[in-house]
Amino acid sequence: NFSFGAGEVIHFKIFYNVIGLYVDAGSASFTVENMKINNKPVYHITGLGNSNPSYDWIFKVRDKYETFIDTSNLKPLKFLRHVEEGGFRKDESVVFNHAENTATSTKGTYKIPNCIQDVLSSIYYARNINFSNYKVGDKIPMTMFLDDEVHDIYIRYMGKEVVKTRYGRYNAIKFKPMLIKGTIFEGGELMSVWVSDDSNHIPLRIESPITVGSVKVDMMGFQNLRYPLQSRISGR
């Protein structure tokens, strides 16, 4: 059984810090739905990220990511990305053919390895890692297709700790993903992620420096988790 199912919705608040004070800068959400592609059952996962309109004059963000992943093995079949970040705009569409080991985008067809993820499906892949199989400091390898390239990345397991968020206190699993440098985030192991230490592994908090300042993302609500949120110590 996977850590999530159709109907799951997770809501986040994004806080921005540039002079030592965190301000409510935006919101994000992830939703999971059932659908079919060529009669194959898939999870249609949508990730939305928006800056608050009052801060759009500083850096406007209107991002939408979609992935369609096979319900049997969590391999992505299709990936869509619409990005508006400051003056940067990008639309991307990728179709994965795992039988032929290819990924076809608007720019061409590329060879891919057998186990490949897109930038959104990789989040749900990571949620299904059994971290009890790893020691603190271990690297968990992953392969991602992004911007028409295959990237060998990893997650570094950092152990377990209690994390206090705007939504409550939780027993959490901490890891650091190796990021690919983009318009907002720097590359490397600068981001820290805490997920619930229970069967859901939902993201509870994300902290990372960005091009200017830093961001903190807190989980603020959810619907239809697959399992009880047993990691919660106190809070809502």
Q: What are the roles of these predicted feature ranges?
A:
Residues 1-96, 134-236:
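Acidic, serine/threonine-rich low-complexity disordered tracts
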Residues 88-131:
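Hydrophobic, well-structured mid-protein blocks that either form specific transmembrane helices
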